[in-house]
From Swiss-Prot:
Source species taxonomy: Eukaryota, Fungi, Dikarya, Ascomycota, Taphrinomycotina
Region of interest (Disordered), residue spans: 184-207, 247-287, 306-365, 522-556, 570-756, 781-813, 848-867, 877-944
GO biological process: mitotic sister chromatid segregation; regulation of mitotic cytokinesis
Assigned GO CC terms: chromosome passenger complex; cytoplasm; kinetochore; mitotic spindle; nucleus
Function comment: Component of the chromosomal passenger complex (CPC), a complex that acts as a key regulator of mitosis. Has a role in sister chromatid cohesion and condensation.
Modification Phosphoserine occurs at: 171
InterPro entries from the UniProt entry: Inner_centromere_prot_ARK-bd
Sequence ranges of Basic and acidic residues compositional bias: 570-580, 624-644, 665-679, 692-702
Main localization of the protein described in the UniProt heading: nucleus
Gene: pic1
Protein name per its UniProtKB record: Inner centromere protein pic1
Length: 1018
């Protein structure tokens, strides 16, 4: 590349870089100007804090700035990396001061300041000094000029109060000129009327010296103002218009000094001083100019009537009389050159044409009655006739203005007063009218509600609420019924002391019993339900309570429950009387409400189970005669279970107790005389300790399964069990010796066992007499829950084996009888002293050490239902043999009770300890996979792998010794792979003998040679 080409390229690149630099600089300057504009607005906000302490507080707590002075919604925030500006802050401050002074001289110096004599309540001079601290010179010059001109004598007030002609009048161009000179608009002169009224005597606030040159707009104005630089002038004009509307409306509504009854009392007469009539004469002397000013600020409304235009014009005049102009620009009056006819026409046009207003018309004016509208029209006609009667004068200038002012002073207050009276009367009439209308509406509603024949569109609001409450009460009643059932069962599971079971009664939910309400209510059923439940009587509560208490609880417990229910039912009488007034009407809509709780579902399930069991009771009545023996064992079983569960209220732990043969004999005679039904539940501990008789409630024998869950047990079985226990105590013969009394069952001494075993059928295969050696049958139930009796201490140690014969069992029984004769005092006391409450596990291997009683006597839950008919049949024929001779009965008494010789379970009887069991081999990872090779999918070999040359080469390599090619395999040296910085230190310890192939545990040379021969390497 030549030098010329490189030079051209360099020049192009230089020009391009310069263009980029210029573009970036322009963009940067624009961003800086935008950012500085945004920063100025925020600094103006911060400068509202006019004391140093406020600024220091903001510095210490910068979060307040975020809360109070957040970024305006429409202000653009530009983030850019700004270089250090070379412009000094002093020059910026100087420019701000110059711009502020120029702004006041150009636009805001036109503001006319009212003297203190006009309004003594507002300290306007203080606020003027507060807002215009840096421009006192220009504002004072304007004020002095106005006062000096107004105090000249012999001249009409209008000519005296004329402003200098060199000041520009109010127009949109002046606003543009004002705001285009400096982008930051300055605060207007007049504050809001509320601030003026609140601070009449405040001292001027001291501004911070650093911000004394800044005058700020309000924060609301900044938020409403769009921040675009191109539309700043238009937004400023619209902002001034909005501000004028708001200020005028605020003055009309909030200023306490202005009253509509006396609108123009403050208007001065022609002989008053010129300073006091400065602004009012200016407004009243040229209504056409005033209208032109308003039309330039606010768009005209043409839908207002003449009376509204009249009131609005008078209100505007009063508002301008009592405040400073919010726009900060005064309009100058011109020399009047028109004749009195033209002035009269302008007055007529002002009075009759629609006038622009700043405020919305109040509702009391727009809602005139016809009579008031007629009066208003008559008033306007009268005003028009008064205008025509005005004296016509040909004198131009001050005479015309004075006559026009006289007309306004004389006529307008009277008309405004009349209009105000009409407005007040119309407002009162409107309030009375609305009140009457509301009263009529209420009367119609009451008539409709009282007339029951009329069907309302919607049902009353109280009726669904009552339905929900009634449904909730019924659900609560079911909860109480279920809680009572659980309460009776908790008494069974309570501990030794009966006081604890009594404490459970006091924890019953205090909800009265109410008849159930489970079906969906309709018009008829809801009425019937309300009529039945609106007055809950104590008899209904008692009848429901008697169902659960009469047959299951002692008299003391019955009285306690009845008293508690009576106390609970008392506070409901008042509620029932109130609810009875709001019963469902026949015309009300059907309400489908049902409150379903978990307890309600549980209660329904319990009722379903009872219904099924009741159906089974009818079928079992036929076989009752053949089951008397079974009931004898079940009765004794229930007694044993009752005594045991008082000690240990566990869910699936049952007890083992000892019984004397005499007790069993007496029990058998008692049951044979009067058969009882099967007990379904466990009596409470408190009822067991009490000796009070219970009412006997005869029930049909059932085959209801006994569940371990106590909440599903019927409480009516308590009385039956306790009644039988009392009968046994009364019918016990007194001829027994003292040892017999010591052999009686004691409820306080029990023995706990774990879950029963599953080997009942196993021992039936060998000898059926072993299954019933204790004369106590096993409860056959799906939950495999039962209790067995402990006959003696010796039976714990000497248990029967499965493989023994009957002769060996008889020898053992004789030994047990001899031990009992030596130790007459035995039973639970002996068991407790020797073994304590030692838990005996039944689910052990039958061929291991015999460490539990009655091993394998109980069926599993899966086979219990299928074996139940056989067990009940066997219980009738099996002899009642115990482990001692005293418990055995002669065979002549029961010839049918013989041990069946047939083996019903041949599979279990053939088992012995020496039986060998063959198990399948365990699948191992080291097993041969030759069997699975056929099942594996064949691998698709590539074409090169199937070439005959490759196969020949592989066959030749099979005889090569890999040690000759690759060398001997050396042991792994961890230090070689993981080298440490310090060679002297060994990071890894040497391997042990079990894995150290480099030590003596290596292969011998003979083993190596043998391996090579087998592989064909040698």
């Amino acid at each position: 590349m030549g030098s010329n080409g490189s030079e051209l390229w360099f020049n192009k690149e230089l020009e391009y870089s310069q263009q980029l630099t210029n573009g970036k600089m322009k963009e940067f300057f624009f961003l800086v100007s935008e950012t500085m504009d945004w920063l100025n607005e925020h600094m103006l906000e911060v400068s509202k804090l006019q004391l140093e302490s406020d600024i220091y507080e903001l510095v210490r707590t910068p979060t307040k700035i975020k809360e109070k002075y957040s970024t305006p919604r429409l202000s653009p925030v530009h983030r850019c990396a700004l270089p250090t500006p070379r412009m000094r802050l002093t020059s910026i401050q100087h420019q701000l001061e110059e711009a502020a002074v120029e702004g006041y001289k150009s636009g805001e110096s036109n503001t006319v300041k009212e003297p203190k004599e006009l309004h003594t309540a507002t300290n306007t001079e203080t606020q003027f000094d507060d807002d215009r601290d840096s421009t006192k010179l220009s504002s004072e010059y304007v004020k002095d000029d106005i006062v000096n001109k107004s105090t000249k004598g012999g001249v009409s007030p209008i000519k005296e109060t004329r402003l200098p002609t060199n000041l520009p009048a109010f127009s949109p161009t002046s606003v543009e000129r004002r705001f285009t000179e400096w982008n930051v608009p300055l605060r207007e002169t007049s504050p809001s009327p509320s601030e003026t009224a609140d601070s009449p005597n405040k001292l001027p606030k001291q501004k911070h010296p650093a911000y004394s040159f800044v005058t700020l707009p309000k924060r609301e104005e900044i938020l409403k103002r769009p921040a675009s630089l191109h539309s700043r002038v238009e937004s400023t004009n619209s902002f001034i218009n909005q501000l004028n509307r708001r200020r005028t409306k605020d003055n009309l509504t909030n200023n306490p000094e202005i009253s509509l009854d006396e609108p123009i009392k403050a208007l001065p007469s022609t002989t008053s001083d010129a300073p006091s009539s400065l602004l009012n004469t200016n407004v009243s002397s040229s209504p056409s100019k005033f209208r032109k000013f308003l039309s330039s600020v606010i768009p005209a409304k043409t839908d207002l009537s003449a009376k509204e235009s009249l009131t609005s014009s008078t209100r505007l005049s009063t508002s301008y009389k009592t405040r400073k102009r919010s726009s900060g620009v005064a309009f100058s009056s011109e020399t009047v050159t028109s004749s009195s006819k033209e002035r009269k026409r302008s007055v007529e046009n002002e009075m009759l044409k629609p006038h622009p207003t700043i405020f919305e018309s109040p509702p009391e004016i727009t809602s005139f009655d016809k009579s008031n509208a007629v009066e208003a029209e008559a008033l306007t006609a009268k005003l028009k006739s008064n205008e025509e009667r005005l004296p016509v004068s040909s004198q131009p200038g001050s005479d015309a203005k004075s006559q026009e002012f006289d007309f306004f002073e004389a006529k307008i207050p009277d008309s405004i007063a009349k209009l105000n009276e009409l407005t007040a009367s119309n407002e009162n009439h409107y309030e009375l009218k609305t009140y009457d209308r509301a009263e009529r509406l209420r009367q119609k509603i009451q008539e409709v509600s009282s007339n029951k024949r009329l069907i309302p569109s919607t049902p009353p609001t109280k009726k669904p609420i009552n339905a929900v409450l009634d449904a909730a009460k019924n659900s609560a009643a079911k909860d109480l019924h279920l809680a009572k059932m659980k309460l009776n069962n908790k008494n069974d599971e309570s501990s030794l002391s009966p006081a604890k079971s009594h404490a459970v009664i006091t924890q019953a939910p205090k909800i009265p019993l109410i008849s159930t309400f489970t079906r969906l209510s309709t018009r008829k059923s809801s009425n019937d339900f309300n009529s039945s439940n609106s007055r809950p009587s104590s008899n209904a509560l008692k009848s429901d309570a008697n169902e659960n208490t009469d047959s299951s609880l002692p008299p003391s417990k019955k009285e306690f429950i009845e008293k508690s229910l009576h106390k609970l039912s008392e506070p409901l009488h008042d509620d029932s009387r109130q609810n009875s007034d709001h019963n469902f009407a026949p015309h009300s809509r059907p309400i489908a409400i049902r409150v379903a709780t978990a307890s309600q579902r549980e209660l329904e399930q319990t009722e379903k189970r009872k219904a099924k069991n009741g159906a089974a009771n009818a079928s079992n009545m036929e076989s009752r005669s053949s089951e008397n023996e079974t009931h004898r064992f079940k009765k004794f079983y229930g007694k044993e279970r009752e005594l045991s569960n008082n000690e240990f209220p566990s869910r699936q732990t049952k007890t083992v107790t000892s019984a004397n043969s005499s007790n069993i004999r007496d029990m058998e005679h008692t049951i044979s005389d009067k058969p009882r039904s099967e007990p379904d539940a466990i009596p409470s501990s408190k009822s067991m300790h009490s000796n009070k008789p219970f009412e006997e409630k005869s029930e049909k024998p059932t085959t209801k399964r006994l569940v371990t869950n106590p909440s599903n047990v019927n409480a009516s079985w308590h009385s039956n069990m306790l009644k039988r226990q009392e009968d046994l105590r009364k019918k016990k013969p007194l001829t027994d010796n003292g040892a017999t009394s010591r052999h009686m069952l004691k409820s306080g001494l029990t023995r706990v066992t774990s879950k029963p075993t599953q080997r009942f059928a196993n021992e039936l295969a060998e000898d059926m007499s072993l299954a019933f050696h204790s004369t106590i049958p096993k409860k056959m139930e799906p939950d495999s829950v039962t209790s067995v009796t402990q006959p003696s201490v010796g039976s714990l140690r000497n248990n029967f084996d499965i493989g023994t014969t009957n002769s060996q069992n008889e020898d053992r029984k004789k030994k047990i009888a001899a031990q009992k004769n030596k130790n007459p005092v035995h039973g639970n006391v002996g068991l407790t002293n020797q073994h304590g409450f030692k838990t005996m596990h039944h689910n052990v291997n039958p061929f291991t050490k015999q460490n539990g009683i009655m091993k394998g006597k109980l069926p599993s839950s899966s086979t219990s239902q299928s074996n139940k008919p056989f067990i009940e049949k066997a219980s009738m024929h099996a002899p009642a043999k115990g482990r001692n001779s005293s418990m055995q009965e002669p065979s002549s008494k029961s010839p049918l009770l013989k041990t069946p010789k047939s083996n019903y379970f041949p599979g279990y009887g053939s088992l012995s300890p020496n039986t060998s069991v063959e198990l399948p081999e365990i699948n191992s990872d080291y097993s041969d996979d030759s069997d699975d090779e056929g099942n594996k999918k064949k691998v698709n070999l590539p074409s090169w792998a199937e070439s005959p040359e490759l196969r020949e080469q592989l066959k030749r390599q099979q005889k090569w010794d890999p040690d000759k090619i690759f060398g001997m395999i050396k042991p792994l040296q961890m230090d070689e792979y993981f080298r440490s910085k310090d060679r002297s230190k060994i990071r890894f310890r040497p391997r042990s003998s079990s894995a150290d192939w480099s030590s003596q545990d290596r292969l011998t040379q003979a083993e190596i040679d043998n391996y090579k021969k087998n592989m064909g390497f040698l």
